Amino acid sequence: DLNGEVSSGGRVCWRSTAINLSRSRTAAGAEPSMVPQPDSEGEWTSEKPIPAPEDTGRAFARVTGDVNPIHMHALSARLFGFPRAIAHGWWTTGRSLAVLGVDESLPGRRLEIAFRRPVELPSTPFLCSRVGADGEISFGLFPAAPAPSGADPVRALVAGVVSG
């Protein structure tokens, strides 16, 4: 685990725990433990395309300074075993939260993200979400538009829960 904390004026304003490069085998039919488990029930209500053009990784690097060959170009990504360049995980998270409209309301809330499989570039994954009675937002980024009943976070490229 990688733990981080940011303080301002002696007050903690951000805290995170990142579990990186974690792989495990599960028994047949068992859910992987790294997938956020939403408490909310109900139908997945939104299905929105999230265009990820071929230059997404380069644009993200220009803004953040996070230059990584797997995000820059298909040629450099192949050197690391990827068939194409892949979107940065924080790009997929940030873009999903912006489309859901929760990017401005995150302070004081909990965000759990599981990066299940890479978002290859270019592609247009689909964002599905549902909101529980308690205001918890569950979302998944899927490689193709699933039927509402098929929006299972275990099948998502990226799965997340915003709560609190």
Where on the chain are the PLM-derived regions?
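Small-side-chain structural scaffolding
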Residues: 4, 16, 57, 61-64, ...
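Hydrophobic beta-strand-centered segment that forms part of the acyl-chain substrate-binding groove
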Residues: 1, 81-82, 91-131, 136
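HotDog/MaoC-like acyl-thioester-processing domains
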Residues: 1-49, 118-121, 126-164
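Catalytic strand-loop segment that frames the active site of acyl-thioester-processing enzymes
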Residues: 18-87, 101
